[in-house]
Amino acid sequence: NNQESNRMNNDARISPRALREIYLKGFEIAVKESQPWTVMSSYNKINGVYTSQSRELQTSVLRDEWGFKGMVMTDWFGGKDAVAQMVAGNDMLQPGLDKQYEAIMEALKSGKLDMSVIDTNVRRVLEMIVKTPRFKGYQYSNNPDLKAHALVTRQSAAEGMVLLKNEGALPVSAEGTKVALYGCTSYDFIAGGTGSGNVNRAYTVSMIQGLENAGFVVDKTLKDTYEKYIADDQAKKREALKGNPMAMFMPLARPEEIVPSASSLQANVAAADIAVITLGRMSGEFLDRTASDFELSANELKLVEGVCSAFHAAGKK
């Protein structure tokens, strides 16, 4: 499924060749090369059948062809027919509803569903459980090594960056270099996406902290301006979300960028050695990408053009 809109009812009509060569290929590689313990079925239908109710997908392709030995679970509240899900080989229904239990019990009593199907599904769930460290007596510390995690994150961030073009801007000497830091994302980093992509982080190293840790000096006037602007914007958005049950899954929308005045730009140019601009986008569960996710807004264009023109005119980066 390539979309979040109407994801619970979307019916993807796909030819067998496109399904095999494009959509299933990544899953096939993952299953065959890594032998995962679990697989999750998606919300949508494929060619008229919910994926969680498709025996062709859950059993014929996944298990018989690819050799998957683990457990299949639904996405939360996925699918419509609990009995069909059992027959398909979707072993666990999440989060589990009374009506699903009742439908399965009724189907067993009427003979519509054979107990051997339930036995197979339960066996696969139990086989997964007995392999877990917890079942084998592992006692978690609830004290993760956050420093080690931070080192991995730092390495991933560096390796994941793409430098499109360098016109003499890099490298920059850090020690004592004064930086005019622009863009709301410079002061409010994005730790994760929306919905299940949200991250319960212990802390986030901001652009300011990163620069200062490296020896740069960040312009305090700009810092104070942005931090107040962002705090006020977030307070308004939190107030607007009060009473919305989805608020806990949705990080606050990014604030509109500040367009600096000509006078403030000149003051920043005089006080700083270089300018850094950070623009950010939020993405994740529940929402599809729109044109504005890829294109710069009017304020972003004005910000980039204004800052670059002012600093370049002064012979600065």
Predicted feature locations:
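Glycoside hydrolase catalytic-domain context in secreted enzymes
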Residues: 1-317
